[in-house]
Amino acid sequence: MNATAAQTKSLEWLNRLRANPKIPLIVAGSAAVAVMVALILWAKAPDYRTLFSNLSDQDGGAIVSQLTQMNIPYRFSEASGAIEVPADKVHELRLRLAQQGLPKGGAVGFELLDQEKFGISQFSEQVNYQRALEGELSRTIETIGPVKGARVHLAMPKPSLFVREQKSPSASVTVNLLPGRALDEGQISAIVHLVSSAVAGLPPGNVTLVDQGGHLLTQSNTSGRDLNDAQLKYASDVEGRIQRRIEAILSPIVGNGNIHAQVTAQLDFASKEQTEEQYRPNGDESHAALRSRQLNESEQSGSGYPGGVPGALSNQPAPANNAPISTPPANQNNRQQQASTTSNSGPRSTQRNETSNYEVDRTIRHTKMNVGDVQRLSVAVVVNYKTLPDGKPLPLSNEQMKQIEDLTREAMGFSEKRGDSLNVVNSPFNSSDESGGELPFWQQQAFIDQLLAAGRWLLVLLVAWLLWRKAVRPQLTRRAEAMKAVQQQAQAREEVEDAVEVRLSKDEQLQQRRANQRLGAEVMSQRIREMSDNDPRVVALVIRQWINNDHE
């Protein structure tokens, strides 16, 4: 019974609400205002960006405390666990927090040395220094774009007084990369040399770099491929430089966009060193370099015995006998000259020997070949037809093609010894197959961003229009119709009241007239009564006159 009564009361309350035309209007208006406010707040809501991620609990609490003191709105990202702030304040907040030493990071740096106590042992001091150095290196490596986190382990050998017992330090680096990111050869080399330069006596070969997947990143570049990224980039730069030179020298002749060139360069990346030693025979003795000279002279004296052919010839004195200097051939390395003089005219004998040694004409040449020398060039050039004033294409003449080919040879540095090849073709370009160039404005990212921002406000206006059209406007229409009906009813009521008032006024006038008539009759009868009392004869004459008029 109570439930039925409550249900009846609820139905009666709903019927009363439905009967009241203001209730739907109020509800629809409130809903429209709420939706509009929500959409405006959504449109004006700031775009949140990541301030810091992968923070420790200490750093996260300190950063949140500082943001609260600065009255900066922030929120936590459930997916990445990062602290997000409005996009326009990210860089400012990072600088302000960095000024306060936040975040400190999971690894401690040189601030660990600020907490050393007095009387600490040398071993503990060395361990703290090594920990601080590892932490600073980890922080530095984490500043590289693809690196999400890093850890560094240093193996520092104990110094020794003996040279043969000294060992080089080594380092192991583990990097945690961002999803979908990787380190290229240049970044790997940069990390290796960064660690090597930060530790005294650490050669780059003793640095090992490993990613979170356990992949060794510091393996030799030639262990799995012939060319590394640096060599490929160098080859691409060489080809691009030659291509730009060809297009730059031919564009003023045939016009911009009327020439396309492709260059293929074969480069030699082998590291070569050559040592050459040459020996040549000595030239003129006057220009030869004297290395050493030895001179021997001997003299003998004694009795001489006569000899010779008997006769007159033997009685003649013998002429002076000079021993000639014998010179070996010029192509010998050691030259020897001997001079001997013997006198048979008496007991005296003299001998002279001279030996000269000259330097060997030797040439030693050590040549280190350049890495990346061009071994061969292959160039292909396509030149468009020239366009006549009437719009018709016309091929270039043989002289023009010969001129273009000669200019291309000079621009590319053509060498027959190297085996270079060049092919120049004159062909009409297909204008419908144009590629490259600047993207249309509707495909540019700036236009897309502006379109998205405008679309957000357009969505707000569209929802507002739909609310006005479907919710607010019908209620206002019904409200206006109800007000009009009420006004019509009021006007009809006023007309009825006016008619009633008019009718009432007529009745009142009739009653007033009747009252006046009654009052006039009473006054007349009173006057007649007074007149009959005062002058009965006049009254009798009046009555006689009335009677006569009635008979007539």
UniProtKB/Swiss-Prot annotation:
Sequence intervals crossing the membrane: 23-43, 447-467
| Cellular localisation | Cell inner membrane; Bacterial flagellum basal body
Start-end of Polar residues biased regions? 293-303, 313-325, 346-358
One GO molecular-function entry: cytoskeletal motor activity
A GO cellular component annotation here is: outer membrane-bounded periplasmic space
Region of interest: Disordered = 272-362
Instruction: Give the record's keywords alphabetically.
Output: Bacterial flagellum, Cell inner membrane, Cell membrane, Membrane, Transmembrane, Transmembrane helix
Please list the residue ranges that the record marks as compositionally biased, kind Low complexity: 328-345
Q: Name one Pfam family in it.
A: YscJ_FliF_C
Q: Can you list the disulfide-bonded cysteine pairs?
A: none
Q: Name one GO biological process term.
A: bacterial-type flagellum-dependent cell motility
What membrane topology term does the record carry?
A: Multi-pass membrane protein
Q: Where is the composition biased (Basic and acidic residues)?
A: 272-288
Q: What does this protein do?
A: The M ring may be actively involved in energy transduction.
Record note on quaternary structure: The basal body constitutes a major portion of the flagellar organelle and consists of four rings (L,P,S, and M) mounted on a central rod. The M ring is integral to the inner membrane of the cell and may be connected to the flagellar rod via the S ring. The S (supramembrane ring) lies just distal to the M ring. The L and P rings lie in the outer membrane and the periplasmic space, respectively.
Q: Which NCBIfam families match?
A: fliF
Q: Which family does it belong to?
A: Belongs to the FliF family.
The molecule here is called Flagellar M-ring protein
